[in-house]
């Protein structure tokens, strides 16, 4: 933005000649910048080249032709000249004989080779705007041409004819007027390549589109042949398009140079060098920059006089904004790039124009000029700011307009040559002084007012620029109307009256948002460029902007009012009736205390009001207290856990006395478990979702169910006998002692091994013994055997895997016979099983170790620990303890291999269990 700032400063310079000279120098610098670029752009490079990708990522940059190497460009360390040196372009490999790509696409051939990345705004200025015609020819050109619809306003046609008159010598301008009319009729149909025309259309669309008030500035910009925006239909079109078609045309004719100068730098027109000269210089970076384009857009209307320029800018903007919607679609993508720079430059330039114009008008008409210019500046600021805002809104318009602007610049350069007379005439007009300006501005204002009235825009209508382009258009029109009206009134009224009326009208027709935004922007702009007017934005129910004129005592008189209004604002904000608008105005307001040096009290008031506003608007406390909220969570978790208690359909439901007993036990145990959890850690209870607890609880449930189901399955009386509550109690500790389980398993294996080989009856006997033993050791074994007792199935001798220990599980799956482990688990009372005292941590937390449920664990693991006893009284497999001997014995007894069917069923059961566990 340095460039744009310098531009703005130059335009700020009071003397037009000065600004013209500056603009000229600036334009030269920009020319340097862009000349190479234009050259490089003559061949339209691939889109990627136009983008600033670092070379390494660009497709055909160097070695990466067609393929991006996974590694960054790795110099030349690997070939012959390993230094790689700068032999060719650094890589030593010249992919293409002409290495255009060594330069980043944005730099073009001219600039230093360092990959200058431009700021968004500078990139845009980079010449989307300057070269807008060229870029328009590129994909952008379509947008710019499509922007020809922007020249929808009749004025655009008028101006098109004017430009044709001036440009018909140029030929392109002729296209422009038809294109303008076309674009008016077919916004997107005409993508004619006439840069001037496209630019005019852009200007129109920008004017109507609210997007780029400054696009007309582009037109006016020295490069855009429309730099004499009058010819460049877009500026006048834009202004006339929305507000004062005739006015724009008149202004275009009168102010063609003026428009150039208005292309944000009045300097070009003021400098008085021929429009052509100014055209080139006008196409200076500042003018070409979107902001400058904005002024030139306005300048069609503005061009009439610097005085009118702001109003007409506003008008042009409003006209832009009305068309902005159409423009928006096209230019939206380009807008973003330019919006930042343009908004800044545009505001600065406008400020500069106003400063320049204000001194002129003030010098000639000090009486009226003081109040008038300040007011007008304020109005212009409002309109300009709003238009600038709308520019932001219609992001598309900007680029398209820029593109077209560049085209127009070229036409405009030609037109400028033809229009030098216009420049001189405009210069004469300016020299004629505020009189002529005021006349023109009055005329332009009246025209624009008439145009607005034709459009039935009411000043009182509150449309928020921020909200949407159409609203912004209406607003801008209203604003322009208001500003024009005020301008007319200014001549009639004393400056103070004018000011007051202006403020009233401005604020009446512009919504609080406009006011606040304008006020903010004004204050910001004034801070940047010292304008004589200072805004005291005091927000009452509706933000009011007061212009603080240093010479005028308005300031002091307004200060108390502003403070009271601040208080009102604070209260209103607290009530949060006015939301965004006032919130924005508050920010302006906060800036005010510093600007106005208001008391700390007012500042505090602002801050308090802000805090309240933010709190109410953005941090509304929920109706539910934290306690209630978390209580609800806890309740939900409890309900969830209770729900889970209910038998799950996918599980096999054993309907057997053991199952019923188990169920009752399960319910009691769960109650106990819940109580424990609640006592110990409500957090965990809240988190029944907590994985560990959930898993543990489920495991318990399963093991209990298994125990019960297994008990039922272990149909043999031995199991039932031993499964008396006593047994459960006995086994409970053991089951709970999953840590003991390993040992228990070993014992159970040994015992089970003896038991398993034995017939079911012997097994049952043994099981009873074992169960007694297991009172210390392994109900696993008992369960396993009890399972078998009912069915003396060979315990998968099939697996005589001696070393298998736990790992035996794989075969254990087939080993459905040894349901021992599951059986064991079943036997343990569930309450006992999970008694935290006994439960070893390893069991609880080790892989959610289902060592109790080893069956589940291993079944999950596909280890085939016969988990499936559920259906058909299958035997629970004893979890393979670690004793290979036991496995050996166990399987030995049954020399028979279990049926494949059983294996399959075991697998099925495993699957079921897995499902259960997952759930």
From Swiss-Prot:
Residues 896-906 have a biased composition (Acidic residues). The modification N6-acetyllysine is found at residues 152, 330, 419, 435, 473. One of its GO terms (biological process) is positive regulation of apoptotic process. Citrullinated by PADI4. Residues 47-63, 160-196, 351-371, 382-395, 444-454, 470-499, 670-749, 762-784, 907-919 have a biased composition (Basic and acidic residues). The modification Phosphotyrosine is found at residues 218, 283, 381. It is found in: Cytoplasm; Nucleus; Nucleus speckle; Nucleus, Nucleoplasm. It holds the Pfam family THRAP3_BCLAF1. Keywords: Acetylation, Citrullination, Cytoplasm, DNA-binding, Isopeptide bond, Methylation, Nucleus, Phosphoprotein, Repressor, Transcription, Transcription regulation, Ubl conjugation. One of its GO terms (cellular component) is nucleus. The modification Citrulline is found at residue 802. Residues 1-454, 468-499, 670-793, 809-839, 861-919 are annotated as: Disordered. There is a cross-link at residues 188, 330, 411, 419, 435, 455, 460, 489-490, 499, 534, 546, 548, 565, 578, 591, 597, 620, 674, 777, 783, 830, 910 (Glycyl lysine isopeptide (Lys-Gly) (interchain with G-Cter in SUMO2)). The modification Omega-N-methylarginine is found at residue 808. There is a cross-link at residues 578, 830 (Glycyl lysine isopeptide (Lys-Gly) (interchain with G-Cter in SUMO1)). The modification Phosphothreonine is found at residues 305, 339, 400, 429, 564. GO terms for molecular function: DNA binding. Residues 135-154, 750-761, 809-824 have a biased composition (Low complexity). The modification Phosphoserine is found at residues 102, 104, 177, 181, 196, 198, 221, 258, 261, 263, 267, 284, 289, 296, 299, 314, 383, 387, 395, 420, 425, 448, 470, 494, 500, 510, 523, 529, 557, 562, 576, 646, 656, 658, 688, 759. Death-promoting transcriptional repressor. May be involved in cyclin-D1/CCND1 mRNA stability through the SNARP complex which associates with both the 3'end of the CCND1 gene and its mRNA. Belongs to the BCLAF1/THRAP3 family. This is Bcl-2-associated transcription factor 1. The gene is Bclaf1.
